[in-house]
A protein has these predicted regions:
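Generic structural signal for well-ordered, non-transmembrane alpha-helical segments
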Residues: 190, 218-225, 250, 254-261, ...
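Glycine-rich beta->alpha junctions and the first turn(s) of the following alpha-helix
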Residues: 139-225
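Short, charged, amphipathic alpha-helical segments
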Residues: 211-219, 243-250, 280
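Glycine-rich flavin
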Residues: 1-95
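Acidic-glycine-rich active-site phosphate/pyrophosphate-binding loop
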Residues: 8-9, 85, 162-170, 272
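C-terminal helix-coil-helix/basic helical segment that borders enzyme active sites and/or dimer interfaces
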Residues: 204, 225-258, 265-277
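DPxDG-like acidic metal-binding loop motif
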Residues: 95-130
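Glycine-rich phosphate/cofactor-binding loops in nucleotide/flavin-utilizing enzymes
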Residues: 273-309
Length: 309
């Protein structure tokens, strides 16, 4: 995929084959594609020239640090990073608790508020290789370990103007927000498809009793088809800033999270005792499904967002 082709159609909506196999890998692919999305939609020509192609081809890896900013936009948290203007850029301090797909030479995009200028925000690329950034390993997760998730500390990080994605960041965030969410769709769509496959796999030995369960593979097949169609329809116009379109995107994301949990729960019940073995993938899919429902924007945040729109 050549850089410059992705900014018209978020590539993550096509990630469901990855999500069908592994939720953690799909999540990391979302992180990388979101980094591509940020660069593709920046108006900073020097940033585009230096990073655009390398992000898109995977020569430089990285992720997204918008969990805290996304929550701050809806009054759930305060922005955790502060920056002050200096010659040639900004100096940034603060800490982010969760940023994924990181390593010693990776980049990620995030947002700080300008000191003494409440509400004025700047989005930038953070370079994990510099000494002013410290990556703190997180405690073991229920699932999704191996995704390069760290707490990140900023100790007077110098952010050159060439690393600024958007200043001011408000209009830029409104431009990229739908794509940011639609990029997550593949995680849920792929997981639901595999849960349907799991239910079908045990139909021969257990179908005579599983037919009494209230949710069947055919039910989720119809739901999956509807979610796929809606995702692709919304992905045709990711820069639409109308409130009605934004509501549809948020509702879709909410439905994807809830459908993922429902499908994994049903698959677990269809498998019965065999699904309770650590060796069976259905218990992993259940744990991954909860991640789809709690990763930013989480189910509770999405419901608040719908209330606020």
């Amino acid at each position: 995929m050549r850089f410059g082709k992705t900014n018209q159609h978020p590539p993550g909506v096509l990630l469901d084959p990855v999500g069908e196999v592994c939720g953690a890998t799909a999540f990391m692919a979302w992180c990388q594609n979101t980094l591509v999305w940020y660069a593709a939609n920046s108006d900073n020509p020097k940033l585009l020239a230096r990073f655009g192609e390398k992000f898109a081809t995977g020569q430089i890896l990285g992720g997204t640090g918008l969990s805290n900013p996304m929550k701050s936009f809806f009054g759930i948290e305060k922005l955790k990073l502060k920056g002050r203007k200096v010659d040639g850029g900004y100096v940034v301090r603060g800490a982010l608790p969760w940023v994924s797909n990181l390593g010693a030479d990776h980049f990620f995009g995030t947002i700080f508020e300008i000191e003494n200028r409440p509400g004025e925000i700047v989005m930038f690329l953070a370079d994990c290789s510099v000494s002013a950034i410290t990556l703190q390993p997180c405690k073991p997760f229920l699932a999704m370990d191996g995704t390069g998730t760290y707490g990140v500390q900023f100790r007077d990080l110098f952010v050159p103007d060439d690393h600024v994605l958007a200043e001011p960041a408000g209009p830029y965030v409104k431009k990229i927000r739908s794509g940011f969410i639609l990029l997550q769709a593949g995680m849920g769509l792929g997981l639901i498809r595999d849960c349907i496959a799991i239910m079908n796999e045990v139909a021969a030995p257990l179908g005579h009793v599983n037919r009494y369960l209230p949710q069947q593979p055919a039910d989720f097949g119809e739901l999956l088809a509807d979610l796929e169609a809606e995702t692709m329809d919304l992905a045709r116009d990711p820069f639409n800033t109308d409130d009605s379109y934004w509501r549809e995107v948020v509702e879709l994301r909410l439905n994807l999270g809830e459908a993922s949990v429902a499908a994994a729960h049903a698959a677990m019940l269809h498998c019965g005792a065999r699904g309770y073995l650590k060796s069976h993938r259905v218990q992993r899919r259940l744990r991954e499904a909860y991640f789809v429902a709690i990763v930013t924007p989480a189910t509770k945040q999405l419901r608040k967002m719908l209330q606020d729109i």
